[in-house]
From Swiss-Prot:
Function (record text): Transcriptional regulator that may regulate the expression of the satratoxin biosynthesis SC3 cluster, one of the 3 clusters involved in the biosynthesis of satratoxins, trichothecene mycotoxins that are associated with human food poisonings.
MF-aspect GO terms: DNA binding; DNA-binding transcription factor activity, RNA polymerase II-specific; zinc ion binding
Protein name listed in UniProt: Satratoxin biosynthesis SC3 cluster transcription factor SAT20
Residue ranges of the annotated DNA-binding region, renumbered to this chain: 306-339
Domain of life: Eukaryota
This protein's GO CC annotations: nucleus
Record carries keyword S-adenosyl-L-methionine: no
Residue ranges that the Swiss-Prot or TrEMBL entry lists as coiled coil: 530-560
Intracellular or extracellular location(s): Nucleus
UniProt feature, compositional bias: Polar residues: 1-10, 25-36, 131-145, 269-282
Amino acid sequence: MPNLPGSSDSTQRHQRNPGTDELVCSSTKPNAAQENADTELAQEKHPQLLSPQTDIPPVCSQPNVSFAQCWDQNFFLDAALTGQNSMTLLGVFDLPNSHMNLTETLSSQLGLEPSQNAFGQGSFDPFVPSSEPSVHSTDNPWPSLPTQLAFQPTNNNTSSLALLGPDPEQLSTLPSSWTGPLDEWPPLDLGQDFAALLSPTYQAFEATPRHTHAHAHQPPRATRHITSQQSPEPYVQVHSTAKIVDRFLVPIAPKPILVERDGPVSGASLPSNPPTALSSTGTRKRKRFNKADRERVNQMRKLGSCFRCRMYKENCDPGLPCKNCMRVQVTRRTFFGPCIRIKWEEVHTFRAGDGDLGQIRATLQTFQWTLGGQVKSIDVQWPFRDDKVKPPILSIECQQFLPKHEHVAEEYSVAGQAYKILLPPWACSNTKAASKKVEAFVRQCQAPLEEEIRHTLNDPILLLTLDEARRYRNETGSKLVATALEIYAGAMMNSRYPASTESDIFGVVDQLHTPYFFDKVPLPPQLTCQIQIMVAQVMLDKQKNALKRLQERALSKNRHKVWYECYLTIFILLATIELVYQVQLRFVKAKQGVSDRNATNLSYVTQYMIEEWEESILTLVGLFHCVMNGGLPFTQSWEDGGENHRLTELDDKALVYVRSLKAEIEQRRGELIALRNRRGRWRYEQPLAAICQLFLPSQDGDKGEGRAAPPS
């Protein structure tokens, strides 16, 4: 049996037993069936104090409980107890009021001078140690430390006693003669009679994080409660998430107690009346949803919260506008944007389908290669209109295949006249290696493609904004605007067919040069399809990254400082949608009057992609109005030193662009309103049909022109 404090050998150091160092128990394990039954009953009474059960194997025959010298980091008493975060809780006990004179013994052991006002009424009132360390007798080797005692009367017969210690920072400033190695500190002598006087009411060891501070070498551990049913049931409560550095034993009652060497102290049996002053403040278990609540949650997960509810972290509802937005429609003071739901995964700015294949999301085909067929490496270029541009070259390994359902003829219509070109069945044989080459090829073509886009634009608003976006990207290094421009260039690349640099590589003679292929030799349709699908896959990845960054900017608290970057990005993405919209329309018109085998597939895929683009346009426009807090930036004053200039912090070149665009919009206001009011299947066929909505109030009567541009 180990030495107990208060015995003749109480001043001797407690020797650790390797066999019981990790687990110390006081009695044999009770009957499992009875324990489970009692535990279920206890869970019904006190569900907030329980967690999964843990078996307690018997080790010791004598009932005992372990106290710790808890001078370690990450072990603090809640500030609500003492008014500070610098004390450590060693234990809490219920004592009969008739034996409160034991506090004098504790005070002398801990170097305290008891105060007559130490007994608070209804709250803990700690002893205040003197500023100077008290002098101890040589009989007590316990270090002189600024320790405290706290009491709380619970009724007329009993009171609660809390044992408090200093924080680790105070220990680090004490003389070395006080601190010393922890293993050499003697146990605190409480006396034999102290444990016997503990109230036999209930007992529960509870390990719950209080003010837990991060520690680089000691992550927080999970809370565990270990319960059992035996009597008598004294109550002891210890709050700890720290490593126990030493321990000694005090006999209390025949109850199993678990002490972990490297974790919190845990114990058994729930109290019939849980304590309130030092009870756990852990997170309560969330109530289970009923069937109606689960259906509502699942529905909202599919729909998503509106922009305002996401920004203010409110519970949204399926309505549009939702109840929260309708509730503040008249009284709102800070957010004036529309109620929209942004499904980022449903925003599409690129032409990802293939009408010939009948695929909404085109994938690479597989072919049956000819046995022993020759592999050729061909050079491909993109047909730039500017003869001064030196186009990059893409080298692809191709092989002949056996056509099954694949058509090797290229059919198109020019001015109502149908043309048909028979091309040999060749396709890329190593698509994995070719995909990497295509990605590098797109990067090399970025600058000339931007120039090609500029040469195709005739509208001043589009030209001004494209030049400003390129300048902003080059001077600020904005990855968001850069990615949007890359998507724009990729859409331009897929708007035309690539061509071979050689005229007779596939046996195609020079006479096959046609205006439809920009006077270039066409490639086999399967090879052209493969290259365009690889470009689309690269652009879809970039689109995902751009939308993710745009979401972060839109929901940030500094939207008034990033609105210009968001505006340029949304403008370029809308211009990209307009481009692919027009390209798809041109492709459909080119197939009219042609004996095309895929007329049904083409119609279905085209209609599906058009609906996606139209929904994406509405989403991006609504997002811009949310970023701008419902305001219209190009109807405001942008004079030097004005409120807009001060809040947005735009540079001089950006201000020049804003003022120039404002003048252009005011001059063409009637034209822009007519474009916005277009309806029908091809309502975004004209340039600026989608972009004009960034400059005009919505058609539902939104009066956003009178508010300042940046959100407050």
